[in-house]
């Protein structure tokens, strides 16, 4: 409402977003009883969906994870520390060029020479241009969002948390094989294997 984008909350933003997802699930269940409910999450939304599957097992009929991944634990820990320090310096809704450059900027460096700052998003140049022209898409996110997301990535990587998922909930993974969020496919395979190791019986992967 204050015109600033890319910030969840001063504290516990990740859990608050997952609570919103659960609230919407309950609302839709009341409006449409008996209708199968599938949860789709893309990119950061896939991380939130994975958190939801841990915190609210057995409450959806299936999950679709698009463009997911899992960065190495030391890198995630460093990202959380850096974003947290920048949060103290700039405030929870502040924007850090350093954090942005080390995160999303690193994705684009894989596609040099670059035509735009968002070449990594798609092979389709028209879609990249449309993204950059949309003020609701091309803004830089807050340091607290990065801090919260790094904490979320730590949470969804822990074996004891993965073990809380409903093993019978079908999960479909799909991603571009050149998507840096998924480590050019390697991170997607890693998460797929993590779900299998956690006992999930119905997981499918498409690159």
Describe these PLM feature segments:
Residues 192-207:
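Catalytic histidine neighborhood in serine/cysteine hydrolases
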């Amino acid at each position: 409402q204050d015109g600033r984008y890319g910030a969840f909350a001063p504290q516990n933003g990740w859990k608050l977003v997952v609570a919103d997802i659960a609230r919407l699930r309950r609302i839709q269940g009341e409006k449409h009883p008996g209708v199968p409910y599938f949860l789709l999450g893309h990119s950061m939304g896939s991380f939130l969906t994975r958190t939801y599957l841990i915190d609210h097992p057995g409450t959806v009929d299936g999950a679709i994870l698009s463009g997911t991944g899992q960065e190495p634990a030391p890198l995630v820990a460093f990202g959380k520390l850096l974003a947290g320090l920048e949060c103290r310096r700039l405030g929870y809704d502040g924007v850090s060029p350093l954090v942005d450059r080390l995160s999303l900027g690193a994705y684009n460096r894989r596609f040099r020479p670059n035509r735009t700052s968002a070449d990594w998003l798609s092979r389709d140049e028209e879609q990249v241009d449309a993204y950059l022209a949309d003020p609701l898409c091309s803004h830089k996110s807050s340091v607290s969002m990065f801090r919260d997301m790094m904490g979320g990535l730590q949470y969804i990587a822990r074996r004891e948390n993965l073990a809380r998922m409903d093993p019978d909930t079908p999960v479909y993974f799909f991603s571009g094989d050149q998507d840096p969020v998924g480590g050019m496919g390697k991170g997607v395979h890693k998460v797929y294997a993590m779900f299998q190791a956690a006992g999930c019986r119905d997981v499918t992967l498409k690159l």
